[in-house]
């Protein structure tokens, strides 16, 4: 079983805990995060993804950063491959944050459940692979060390912002 996630903002503690538990069960998890370096053309602090990434790295989850070059990786995609069981593709407008998932923002998501050889599942898998791996002519992502932030101050700042809702993510 494999779980591939490509997301603009990841900060919801229950989502992070579920991803960590899945990895502990042996699910191969790959997470592709926006480095939160730019938000709509304005330089950012990296909160929340750079801090949340520490929890993923500590759980031995594979992580890469979208190489945004001044833009944002605005996708919100989760793809679960389950061998002979149906695949699940979740995509839409919701970030994996408390504001988005706890009904504080109006969001719309779609879950597509189909056989692993379904054309839409295949296209979603190919898009994730293209973004995860780089080629000689296409560069979409960079390794985990590029944006990792080990600052305890910013980690707890992000946790307070997520818990309180005093944030825009």
Question: At which residue positions do the language-model features occur?
Answer:
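PLD/PLD-like phosphodiesterase catalytic module centered on the HKD motif
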Residues: 2, 12-169
């Amino acid at each position: 079983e494999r779980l591939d996630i490509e997301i603009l903002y990841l900060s919801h503690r229950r989502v992070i805990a579920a991803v960590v538990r899945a990895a502990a069960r042996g699910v191969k998890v790959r997470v592709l995060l926006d480095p939160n370096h730019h938000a709509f053309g304005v330089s950012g602090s990296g909160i929340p993804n750079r801090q949340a990434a520490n929890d993923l790295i500590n759980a031995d989850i594979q992580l890469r950063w979208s190489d945004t070059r001044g833009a944002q990786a605005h996708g919100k995609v989760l793809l679960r491959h389950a061998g002979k069981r149906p695949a699940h593709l979740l995509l839409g407008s919701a970030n994996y944050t408390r504001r988005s998932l706890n009904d504080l923002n109006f969001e719309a998501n779609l879950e597509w459940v189909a056989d692993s050889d379904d054309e839409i599942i295949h296209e979603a898998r190919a898009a994730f692979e293209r973004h995860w791996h780089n080629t000689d002519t296409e560069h979409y992502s960079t390794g985990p060390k590029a944006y990792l932030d080990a600052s305890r101050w910013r980690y707890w700042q992000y946790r307070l912002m997520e818990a309180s809702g005093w944030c825009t993510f």
